[in-house]
């Protein structure tokens, strides 16, 4: 992907991470809270990113190489074509594997970009059940699995729209992210419309992160 166009796909080389591991996330266009990035990781150089979390949702796609994703006490090996979903406030990190250059594209966005705000049916029916369920912090997207392949195809369309920045690209980005999230909800969280009990470990971890975030500077 190039870095031209109004909605520039930026190269991610460094991150600002607070003491409580929250990543500082600023979107270039505040009225359109969505950022697209590319990163090149390789052992011996910049080989990934450290533990962090953010209030935004993240979707990544591996273009080449191998990347190991860590989240919720699990690790997932992502190969070229695979992807990864990271829910809001989920602690995670990535690390390149092998000696081949890893080229990764990712999208970070405020859920309200898709829902239009908490007072909409889109938020209440589709977005809230996904982002408020801490039993669902992440999801590996296997390019060889048909449903995951459809989700990954939506991500590719998002990057194409961001790269070309043709008139109306905001609609294309919002639509394709929304469809990807809907497929995630329907395929992996069929019970998400019901209140799920949070695992005690996840609940304690989030409580600790929230406490550190609000009280560290006092």
What are these regions (language model features)?
Residues 1-83, 89-90, 124, 135-139:
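Generic protein-terminus/edge-of-domain signal
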Residues 9-35, 40, 95-159:
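A hydrophobic/aromatic-rich effector-binding and dimerization subdomain
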Residues 58-61, 150-154, 176, 183:
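Amphipathic, well-ordered alpha-helical segments in soluble domains
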Residues 68, 93, 215:
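Detector for the N-terminal beta1/A-loop initiation region of ABC nucleotide-binding domains
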Residues 86-87, 109:
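A conserved hydrophobic position in a structured secondary element of the catalytic/binding core
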Residues 137-148, 162-218:
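Short, Lys/Arg-enriched, Trp-marked, Pro/Gly-tolerant hinge/linker segments that flank
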